[in-house]
């Protein structure tokens, strides 16, 4: 089967949700995508995760994973559910200022498809 990842601006209006859902349904039904990798940096990532959570009830064969850019600290553990996350091997040695870029490179290498939200 195939994998998909997401990249987009931090700010994302709720009006994007129906189109995102439509695109994801097409990827699942027409292109056999069953694995999704999501970041956690902004509204687009949160929206993608939310839509995937809904779609997993309709399409139980799909899975989604939040890909962490850094290991969680004590404060993160108090507010974040890490049950659906992974931390790619090798990122622990990456300087913090490069962590998101390296995580994104890892996600891109895993993906057959990329869904984006860009406003420029």
Predicted regions, residues:
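Acidic/glycine-enriched connector segments
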Residues: 1-120
């Amino acid at each position: 089967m195939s994998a998909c990842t997401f990249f987009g601006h931090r700010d994302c209006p709720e009006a994007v949700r129906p189109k995102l859902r439509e695109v994801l349904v097409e990827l699942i039904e027409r292109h056999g995508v069953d694995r999704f990798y999501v970041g956690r940096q902004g509204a687009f990532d949160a929206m993608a995760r939310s839509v995937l959570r809904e779609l997993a009830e309709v399409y139980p064969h799909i899975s989604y994973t939040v890909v962490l850019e850094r290991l969680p600290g004590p404060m993160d553990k108090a507010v974040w559910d890490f049950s659906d996350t992974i931390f790619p091997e090798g990122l622990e040695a990456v300087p913090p200022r490069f962590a998101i870029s390296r995580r994104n490179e890892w996600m891109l290498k895993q993906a057959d498809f990329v869904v984006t939200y860009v406003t420029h």
